[in-house]
Amino acid sequence: MTSCRYRARLASLVLAFVTMLMWSPLHAQTSGVTGAVGISSELVDRGLAVSPPTPIVQGALSWTSPSGWSLGASAATEIRSPGKVSEALVQVSKYWSLSNEWQMRGSVLYYDYPGNARAKYFDRSEASVDWIYRDILTFGLSGICLTNGDEHQPRGAADVNFHWPLAWHFSVSAGVGVAQSLLSPYGPNGYGHASVYRYGQLGVIWSYGPWRMELDRVAADPGSHRQWGNLVASPWVGTISWSF
């Protein structure tokens, strides 16, 4: 119970701090604030479902400075349970230009699922480094530390994502990744090593002005099906969003 109260206070403080920075008059002349709202058929995180297959309302705000800093916060809730926050995320990032075509991004993220008992094992903090080629190809490495329960052995993940624009406002996206599972087997000598699983997605995107629609085919290897059971994502996930 103490851990839950601590995480709730920490999430509230970080969210308040990010919101203050976003809207502070000090940055009004030099920063850009953007946001988005949308509806998804399911919340999926690295190939695993962190919500039931039910409509999810999501909202996000981000602030970006000319020097490459970015602060963001987002939240999601099930339409059938609007009073419960299914997912909350806070992110701080810094971009560096490596050349005319390459960028590097370092990020620190905090995930919390306060009203989502199904995803309690996904509460975590992450540090990641990404290399980005012309907004087409992204390669990322992540270090993960769980913030819930008694098992805090560090995990790792690696992801490659691809995005290619097509005609008539369409584009295709694809991604593959490998990660250590967030649950480790428990034996007589304590927690063992986290197993490794693979995941991926292939999708089509239509965007026009502030509107965006996306349909993804999501997959994970059979090992994750045996280990996670009802946390296996639906094969198809759809999202429609509006940005401002």
Description of each model-found segment:
Residues 28-79:
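Short glycine/proline- and aromatic-enriched beta-strand/turn motifs that initiate or cap beta-hairpins
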Residues 33-35, 55-61, 88-90, 104, ...:
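Hydrophobic, lipid-facing positions within transmembrane beta-strands of outer-membrane proteins
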Residues 33-35, 67-73, 100-106, 135-141, ...:
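Repeated loop/turn-to-beta-strand initiation elements of outer-membrane beta-barrel proteins
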Residues 39-45, 75-79, 110-114, 133-135, ...:
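Transmembrane beta-strands of outer-membrane beta-barrel pores
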Residues 41, 63-65, 94-96, 102, ...:
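Residue-level signature of outer-membrane beta-barrel architecture
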Residues 46-55, 77-87, 114-123, 145-156, ...:
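Solvent-exposed loop/turn segments connecting transmembrane beta-strands
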Residues 120-188:
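Detector for outer-membrane/organellar transmembrane beta-barrel domains
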Residues 202-211, 230-244:
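Outer-membrane beta-barrel "beta-signal"
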